[in-house]
Amino acid sequence: MSNDTSPGTSSVDSKSSDPSYGVPGHSHSDKDLLKLSLGAIGIVFGDIGTSPLYALKECFKGHHQLPVDDFHIYGLVSLIFWTMGLVVTVKYVMFIMKADNKGEGGSMSLLSLIIRGANPKLSRWLIVLGVFATALFYGDSMITPAMSVLSAVEGLTVIEPSFDSWVPPVSVVILIGLFCIQARGTESVGRLFGPIMLVYFATLAILGAFNIITRSPAILLALNPYYAIHFFASDPLQGFWALGSVVLSVTGAEALYADMGHFGRQPISLGWYWVVFPALTLNYLGQCALLSADHEAIANPFYFLAPDFLRVPLIILATFAAVIASQAVITGAFSVTQQAIQLGYIPRLRVNHTSASTVGQIYIPSVNWVLMFMVMVLIAMFKNSTNLANAYGIAVTGTMFITSCMMGVLVHRVWHWKAWQSIPLVSFFLLIDGAFFLSNVTKIPEGGWFPLLVGFVVFTMLMTWSRGRHLMAERMRQVAMPIQLFIRSAAASAVRIPGTAIFLTPEDDGVPHALLHNLKHNKILHERVILLTVKIEDVPYVDPHYRASMSSLEDGFYRLIVRYGFMEEPDVPLALNKIEQSGPMLRMDDTSFFISRQTLIPSTHTSMAIWREKLFAWMLRNSESATEFFKLPSNRVVELGSQIELVGSNGK
């Protein structure tokens, strides 16, 4: 629960069946549909759209190199085509994108959807899966900008091989510039993303079709799944290893689901079916037609698709596409972080709005600078896209596998599918995802360790924060005085002064620490005392008409509950202003806010390992204050400190 006494956001309440929660689904006119599809092409498909820069090349030059001959060329392009068809089209577009949480997608949204009403044991395992998928996403958010920009800038070596040493520093300059402009927002230039990516995908399609026609029209036969099956049947071990590079063709598939709340399922599907999938297919086929005619083009088949005089413009266009793909991942990291803060897995962080008119345009400084630092580390460590490709696939395939696991729970518990319906379909997805993941496990020594390390570090921090908050809330419930007892005893004899005091409290049935400290030290109570609890629900948005509910207790005490969805930013003064308009009792110019700031003290009875307790204490100290997080007027806030000792059941 996001409040003064709890360092994170509120415990999630299940209100999905209440019509007051959530927002209507997406419905669009034809004009709006085209605009949203163009926007989706610019944001959602940036990552998967830059895959042709490196995916096919890595199949032949990567971890397990393959001979450049027609057998492998036809087999691999057939495998890439059917991977895109099965993973992106069937799994994500036709199936997973139907699993929206009031229009929102992504791991956190799916997690909040499937744990509703689940028994505690199942919930714990689901939370572990969902949080680990989120942790892997942060590793992917570090690798994608480095991989995309390095691959684009490596086009310089096609023009002049001696430019090879310039690729890392040029990539660093481009990415530092990208991270530095985040604070200003990208709304103005963001309008150009769709048109630029549309030109980029058109270029992919034209170059691919040109090479198919002029080099080897027979490559179209590779659309027959026979070639993919024959490739595997001839050498199953070699086929298994190849999956580790083939999966690079679908990096970014998770973005279709994660960004569904911004554009809607229909515009994303339209963009995939009519623009992105055909363009990618033609480009991969074109690269393979080129390789079939000229095996030496494997050095960089993407750029060799273009005639000499078009390579510089293609490098510029590909670099723009790589920057847009990187921007989409950075924005996604901000969005996922905001959701995790609201759902109580990450401490309160400073969140800045970069647009007064567009919802969701946010900037989180701490996340931005950590991502930038880690991207620079990656470029310094791996130096080129071939080396970095070894680190890329494992985070992507791990997230895909976990999403399939959670979907299995969804179709059984939420959609109530019969076993004969759900088991074959989910097993099919798990088989595909599992094969891709295991193939990438072989890359762990060459770079796959990096996203796993990042994932485990982030997972540990998220679970430590969640566990620490739970223990803190448990301890505060143990020592809290019932509000009715407080009103009848201490409050009845206190001196009352004019005005309104609002005390933020994590629970809606106890006396907040700040109220007890205020009465103990100041010996007074205000004429009106409001106990305010901010609750984050398990839906993306809460209907503003049901935002706040106030009930009278007795003797000038009131209970106020303000609700937000996990995609919303709490703005307490704005919510109180709505109440003020409905009656004269609450006037902001006559109101003071009292909040409590906890300090964790060492405990010999803690149920957390000592290193986790110290980690939680550090995160607690560095979390943003409730004043900033809830947008309280700083000149009307009184902050009172308190100490707390974690206790709880045994366990680590």
From Swiss-Prot:
InterPro entries in UniProt: K+_transporter (IPR003855), K_trans_C (IPR053952), K_trans_N (IPR053951), Kup (IPR023051)
Main localization (coarse): membrane
Record field: transmembrane: 36-56, 76-96, 125-145, 161-181, 193-213, 228-248, 270-290, 314-334, 362-382, 391-411, 419-439, 444-464
Keyword Membrane: yes
Ranges of Low complexity composition bias in the record: 1-20
Region described as Disordered: spans on this chain: 1-26
Keyword Membrane: yes
Entry keywords, A to Z: Cell inner membrane, Cell membrane, Ion transport, Membrane, Potassium, Potassium transport, Symport, Transmembrane, Transmembrane helix, Transport
Gene Ontology terms: cellular component: plasma membrane
Lineage: superkingdom: Bacteria
Subcellular location: Cell inner membrane
Catalyzed chemical reaction(s): K(+)(in) + H(+)(in) = K(+)(out) + H(+)(out)
MF-aspect GO terms: potassium ion transmembrane transporter activity; symporter activity
Topology in membrane: Multi-pass membrane protein
Annotated function: Transport of potassium into the cell. Likely operates as a K(+):H(+) symporter.
Family: Belongs to the HAK/KUP transporter (TC 2.A.72) family.
Designated name of the protein: Probable potassium transport system protein Kup
Source organism (scientific name): Zymomonas mobilis subsp. mobilis (strain ATCC 31821 / ZM4 / CP4)
Lineage: Bacteria, Pseudomonadati, Pseudomonadota, Alphaproteobacteria, Sphingomonadales
